[in-house]
Design a protein with these regions (language model features):
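N-terminal signal peptide c-region/cleavage motif recognized by signal peptidases
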Residues: 13-15
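Calcium-binding acidic motifs and repeat modules
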Residues: 3, 17-142
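Sec-dependent signal peptide recognition
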Residues: 1-9
Length: 142
């Protein structure tokens, strides 16, 4: 059920918005308060929601099978709705990858490990260093 909700949420992108605004699909999905700006707190909140969606056995860790499904779903969404894994979207994909999030290298990604990477993920995308992620961070040279 959670995966169906994630797939539905990912598919709800506004096509016209996505075509005209750099990073629109990402902003639409990660801007939790709808102000067009993403804070580190919103990144942390969304990462927590994503973790819960893919922790199918609810044991507090993403195992190899759960992370494989997460990788497949995320990459399909990026390809279909965000112009593919290039530019800033390559950074999004990298920051959600298992190797980025498995801090202790045990093959499992705990909620604590996943959540602890929120600030690093934010810093990767806040290219202009203004303390928020906006469409400006997705423009060439952002």
């Amino acid at each position: 059920m959670r995966l169906l909700l994630l797939a539905s949420a990912c598919a709800l992108g506004t096509a016209a918005l996505a075509q005209g605004t750099p990073g629109a699909h990402f902003i639409e999905n990660w801007d939790m308060d709808g102000d067009g700006l993403i804070t580190v707190a919103e990144i942390a909140e969304k990462r927590g929601e994503i973790f819960v969606m893919f922790d199918q056995n609810e044991d507090g860790a993403l195992d190899a099978a759960e992370y494989d499904l997460f990788d497949e779903t995320r990459r399909a969404d990026i390809e279909a709705n965000a112009g593919g894994r290039k530019g800033p979207m390559a950074l999004v994909d990298q920051a959600m990858d298992r190797t980025f999030n498995d801090a202790d290298g045990d093959g499992l990604v705990s909620l604590d490990e996943f959540g602890a990477q929120a600030p690093a993920f934010f810093d990767m995308l806040d290219k202009n260093g203004d303390g928020v992620i906006s469409s400006a961070d997705f423009k060439p040279g952002g």
